A protein has these predicted regions:
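N-terminal accessory/pre-domain segments preceding catalytic cores
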Residues: 1-89, 101-102, 112, 122-130, ...
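Short, conserved phosphate-binding/catalytic loop or strand-edge motifs used
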Residues: 92-99
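An acidic- and aromatic-residue-enriched active-site/binding cleft used to recognize and process polar
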Residues: 93, 107, 126, 133-136, ...
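Conserved short loop/turn motifs at secondary-structure junctions
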Residues: 99-107
């Protein structure tokens, strides 16, 4: 419980009902991943309203599918591509649809679909996030973040590089 409280913001600690936090605490699959607290247990994906969705997914996702998706998260990406229709016109205010609502309706705007994917992945024990700088949806596989592109045919591996800056001081006038 302390780990969960440590990963959410102080505002979420104050504003989120205990029932929501208990749902995430009691229904998050255990993992020895170093990413567990931040990217599996954490109920916060983006700026959505926090809801108790993990118990719902625990009872509504087929266990065989859950195992298959955990072994290969690309299976989950493909399922979301095939099963969730995108209709941005239905949400002109851009208020995030709750993950359970996306599951039941099978329709979402792009942002709600992205939050849904991360929420469902985390519910299955897959480390996932919306990358904070570029806002890319990603899951972690074998220690590497993999970009999720719902339009592409294959997963996109995040490219890493190294930036070196040097500075040579000059005398001031």
């Amino acid at each position: 419980a302390i780990a969960l409280l440590g990963v959410i913001s102080s505002k979420d600690v104050r504003d989120t009902p205990a029932s929501v936090l208990v749902d995430h605490l009691n229904n998050t699959p255990q993992s020895d991943s170093e990413l567990y607290t931040e990217y599996i247990m954490n109920p916060r994906v983006a700026l959505e309203f926090l809801t108790p969705y993990k118990s719902f997914f625990a009872t509504n996702v087929d266990p065989a599918f859950a195992k298959q998706a955990k072994d290969d998260p690309q299976v989950l990406v493909q399922w979301v591509k095939d099963s969730i229709s995108i209709n941005n016109a239905l949400n002109p205010q851009r208020i995030s649809i709750m993950p359970i609502g996306v599951w039941k309706a099978r329709v979402a705007d792009i942002n709600s679909r992205d939050i849904f994917f991360v929420a469902l992945a985390r519910s299955l024990g897959i480390p996932a996030r919306i990358e904070p700088v570029a806002r890319k949806v990603q899951y972690n596989k074998e220690g590497q973040w993999v970009d999720v592109d719902f339009e592409a045919a294959a997963p996109v591996n995040t490219k890493y590089g190294k930036v070196v800056a040097s500075y040579t001081p000059i005398k001031a006038l």
